[in-house]
């Protein structure tokens, strides 16, 4: 999935959570079949932690794959 598609999908997942351009670039490494699950995981983690912007540091800190 390309960066622009990821950016659109990620930033429409929740109106209160924004994904940075760098975070969306990092998400290009996620296989297409797992993209919705990855975005939903990050949105839920952001909500749980009171975060409104998902950046690369947040992705790394909350990566369920370690």
Locations of regions flagged by a protein language model:
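Non-catalytic accessory segments flanking P-loop/AAA+ NTPase cores
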Residues: 1-66
């Amino acid at each position: 999935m390309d960066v622009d598609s990821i950016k659109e999908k990620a930033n429409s997942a929740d109106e209160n959570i924004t994904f940075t351009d760098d975070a969306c670039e990092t998400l290009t490494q996620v296989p297409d079949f797992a993209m919705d699950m990855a975005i939903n995981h990050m949105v839920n983690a952001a909500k749980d932690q009171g975060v409104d912007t998902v950046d690369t540091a947040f992705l790394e800190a909350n990566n369920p794959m370690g």
